[in-house]
């Protein structure tokens, strides 16, 4: 799966891995995985982090090697690519006229009627949080941040 990484990514990830290889034995402590991922700019949830730790430390020794880390990063990038494709497809569903943004009324209707419906107050809070530039529409970047939870914490 590391084959999905570019040579530049492999070099970068190996360098970061080596920074955490304190003993120079080709191993990093599983407990350091969160810090390592954070340095790369990836901030997984606790559940995702636990799953990643299981993936790289299959024998439960408390450490993982660089190859396992590169495989993990390949999987992460593949999932990210797939997620991006899904988000683009979802955005296009709402942006039927290809304006590059979603009208508030359209998004509000969907949030209140599809999937796990929100009430009107929750939908408005979510849209206000997502509309970072305050223009009354949700562009693709705002949509991605909203859908991935990067910009939104539902508070009541």
UniProtKB/Swiss-Prot annotation:
PANTHER family given in the database record:
CALMODULIN 2 (PTHR23048:SF56), MYOSIN LIGHT CHAIN 1, 3 (PTHR23048)
Q: Where is the EF-hand domain?
A: 8-43, 44-79, 82-117, 118-153
Asked if the record carries the keyword Metal-binding, the reply is: yes
User: From which source organism is this entry?
Assistant: Tropidechis carinatus
Keywords attached to this entry: Calcium, Cytoplasm, Metal-binding, Repeat
Protein name per the record: Calglandulin
One GO term describing the cellular component: cytoplasm
Q: Please give the tissue specificity annotation from the record for this chain.
A: Expressed by the venom gland.
